[in-house]
Amino acid sequence: MDSVSFEDVAVNFTLEEWALLDSSQKKLYEDVMQETFKNLVCLGKKWEDQDIEDDHRNQGRNRRCHMVERLCESRKGSKCGETTSQMPNVNINKETFTGAKPHECSFCGRDFMHHSSLNRHMRSHTGQKPNEYQECEKQPRKHKAVEKTFSYHHCFRKHERTHTRVKPYECKQCGKAFIYYQPFQRHERTHAGEKPYECKQCGKTFIYYQSFQQHAHTGKKPYECKQCGKAFICYQSFQRHERTHTGEKPYECKQCGKAFSCPTYFRTHERTHTGEKPYKCKECGKAFSFLSSFRRHKRTHSGEKPYECKECGKAFFYSASFRAHVITHTGARPYKCKECGKAFNSSNSCRVHERTHIGEKPYECKQCGKSFSWSISLRLHERTHTGEKPYECKQCHKTFSFSSSLREHETTHTGEKPYECKQCGKTFSFSSSLQRHERTHNAEKPYECKQCGKAFRCSSYFRIHERSHTGEKPYECKQCGKVFIRSSSFRLHERTHTGEKPYECKLCSKTFSFSSSLREHEKIHTGNKPFECKQCGKAFLRSSQIRLHERTHTGEKPYQCKQCGKAFISSSKFRMHERTHTGEKPYRCKQCGKAFRFSSSVRIHERSHTGEKPYECKQCGKAFISSSHFRLHERTHMGEKV
């Protein structure tokens, strides 16, 4: 069995963590370290530096870094059995008892207990970086690849890992590996949820010391931008801000070449290539690439809505939704497009709009190749492939792919319509619906197709129209493989498989799969036929029927088969015709399994099992399975030859 090394048992503090300890905790740390030294038996090297606190005060270095490095280095030449008298003992020197620090820096006047500590400190003034390492056979302390020199051997060893890419610290939960121990420690907190830094004023806790520092209530912002005057609490934030003026983007992705001004944005971007999702929900097991997405997801379980409007009391899951809502009270639209001058109530909406001018779409779907302007749009699109529906209605348990669809559905239970049109007084459940409605008053159509010039009031209609040019059909039925341009058409199609008929006639209780079918059916009871043909006077129940009828006068047949050239008046007849070429029979009888090309055919066939004959002759009482058979029978009474 391998002997235990000092690295295996030593406790490591960062400079920030050390600053949070009180005097009793620091004393306890020194006692523990002392006990650790005494229990190790295979070390072999006399220690020059016996001042733990001087080690800590070396700015930017670990609390015990010199101690660790020298102990670990000395093990290579040590012999087992040497006594522990060679261990450093912070209490054995006279200076330690008295607290005297006889070694003074001639540059800055700082005092040190030990000469070795003073020597190391002097290098910060002289810039000296010794090129020989005495304990390693006089080998130069230089890195061969870049000829970079270091003042301390432990820094040299750490730097080497940046070239060798050795990552000795691996997370047991997600497998992510790290070059250095401290980032590994910090990463582990993201899994454990540990937040060791607590604000004494408000009780808020933080994973990272830097976040804790930035949160401070002092109000001090010592770092001010000379160009715009904006001030910052921490230097890193100030540095990042300066890059917005200079345009500097020092962090470049090796896979796609995209550059970033901030390392956090760069690391986040890398996950789009690796697919890494380090944040996992304990309740449902769903994993996320970004901490912010993970936090937002947790609210779907807890129901927490931390953002509340002071005017109307409405609460929101997300800060962005809250900010957008607040503006509905004021009517302000402070964000203006630089190209066309259009104003928006949120910066995000403005940025999305600006991409319509430049055409930038950096996020591409790996399954179908479609690209998007925003990562959130890509994630939402991916659900059309996976069928994922993470949003569930608490009242009826219906699930949805998008949070917006859930919110829209929830209003069917509450009936709430908080958004009112100032011109006509009409109310809406959503601000987006109000915005679309307002365009009917001002005739605004901001979404224009670059291919044909057609303009649209609504971005969703515009996207659907674009598919008529590209031929894209992103919604695929898992049962029969049929694909659709619109999600609404896809959902309606699914009902042909499930048999779901949610729309019921109040007069005769007949049910329908589609609301449009119910509306058309209701006209049968009223007998009203409001759509009349101007040429022949024939009246129809539906506007779609009169449009088809008018084509019999004009001879227009807009739907042409690419295989045989045959043209059709209606899209439905065209689709039916296509099946004669493909042989597709998507409609199957649930009782005997027989398949049919047309839904009407399967309905008529099913009546052969049920015995239903809905078409009855008023003259003789004879009943028929299908309307076509019934019409043929009627002619026998009129004297027509069938």
From Swiss-Prot:
Provenance organism: Pongo abelii
Taken from the record, one Pfam family name reads: zf-C2H2
- Which keywords does this chain's UniProt record carry? DNA-binding, Metal-binding, Nucleus, Repeat, Transcription, Transcription regulation, Zinc, Zinc-finger
Gene name of this polypeptide: ZNF14
InterPro entries noted in UniProt: KRAB, KRAB_dom_sf, Krueppel_C2H2_ZnFinger, Znf_C2H2_sf, Znf_C2H2_type
Question: Under the GO molecular function aspect, what terms does this record hold?
Answer: DNA binding; zinc ion binding
- Give the location in the cell: Nucleus
PANTHER family attached to this UniProt entry = IP01015P-RELATED
Cite the KRAB domain residue spans from the record.
4-76
Tell me the protein family, please.
Belongs to the krueppel C2H2-type zinc-finger protein family.
Renumbered zinc finger spans (C2H2-type): 103-125, 141-163, 169-191, 197-217, 223-245, 251-273, 279-301, 307-329, 335-357, 363-385, 391-413, 419-441, 447-469, 475-497, 503-525, 531-553, 559-581, 587-609, 615-637
- GO CC annotations, alphabetized: nucleus
Name of the protein: Zinc finger protein 14
Q: What is its main location?
A: nucleus
Q: Name one GO biological process term.
A: regulation of DNA-templated transcription
Task performed by this protein: May be involved in transcriptional regulation.
